[in-house]
Amino acid sequence: MLAQSWAFSRLAIDDGEIWRFAAANFAHLSWPHFAGNLLVFAAAVLLLRAVATPLEIVGVFLLCAIGCTLGLYLGSSLAWYVGASGALCGLLAWGASRLPGAIGPGLLALLTINVAMDQSRTLSWLGEPLAPQGHYWGLACGLALAIISGWRASDAASGWPGAAGAAARSDA
């Protein structure tokens, strides 16, 4: 299941293999690891389908995937990483900011507690090695995207051209 040429490898990235920033999120330790991530992604799509388009969901997932591995590269000493768990944490954090009522804050609280508890774990629920830093960086990226998209939405609603660009400014 693991494609060595896809894994986040600090040494390989230092040698110019920058595709690993994205590809590492699509390589997994095992089929159960892949299936678990795929199930979480499917659940996230079902949860967010009323508040986000499929393009937004995929776009945020991909941004969180790259943001997670960039965070690992720049903000940790982790040498090797595979899996989409970090990107999924980011997608769910971003999605929580869009969910109505208590659902969003509740999801974000549970996600944050889980990521905090992960920081002291070395094995996943599958008994495979865990890189909790990935969950942390994914969560951070998702929260950053939630803040940015929230600002852009509120800018558009107030008439400020933050979301609509220069064209909206010239129309005012």
Describe each region flagged by the PLM.
Residues 1-162, 171-172:
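A detector for small-residue-rich transmembrane helices and their helix-helix packing motifs
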